[in-house]
């Protein structure tokens, strides 16, 4: 991809893609990483423009109106940390594996989502922005106050995931 992303990963991918295109005698076409995510729903559906998109990745959290190829309107975004970062940090605090998303999901299915009341930042604001830094801090505080038993991990994962859903979908 042409960006955005981690510079080392982009450099390796760019070098490989250029060499591969040359070896195959094909043109090299740079693609924006986020645009790839934004257009992926059209790969296996007859989705028409415009459509709403919730774009969540390791470094980005946005609501977009996809108007057409290359034309996007940002309706909301994170004002601090990306959701993927919050999932990875929570998984790390709970001593789960990486990437955090699948690990949190696995534990959350067996936990009590109502055990821990975590903050819902910006939920009453009249915009579509997110904030996940406070949620990460709240999880860290609760983890520091408890023994990290399997039950605790399941309940915290469920509470975290439930809270994230409340933030995104309210």
Predicted regions, residues:
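Short, acidic/small-residue loops that bind anionic groups at enzyme active sites
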Residues: 17-38, 78-80
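Short, well-ordered alpha-helices that flank and scaffold nucleotide-derived cofactor binding pockets
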Residues: 18, 22, 40-44, 92, ...
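Acidic, glycine-rich active-site loops and adjacent beta-strand->loop/helix elements
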Residues: 1-6, 32-38, 60
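A short helix-loop
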Residues: 48-49, 54-57, 62-152
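Short beta-strand-loop/turn "lid" adjacent to the catalytic site in phosphate-handling enzymes
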Residues: 1-18, 22
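Phosphate/ATP-binding catalytic cores across multiple sugar-kinase/actin-like superfamilies
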Residues: 159-170
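Conserved phosphate-binding catalytic cores of ATP/NTP-utilizing and phosphoryl-transfer enzymes
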Residues: 30-52
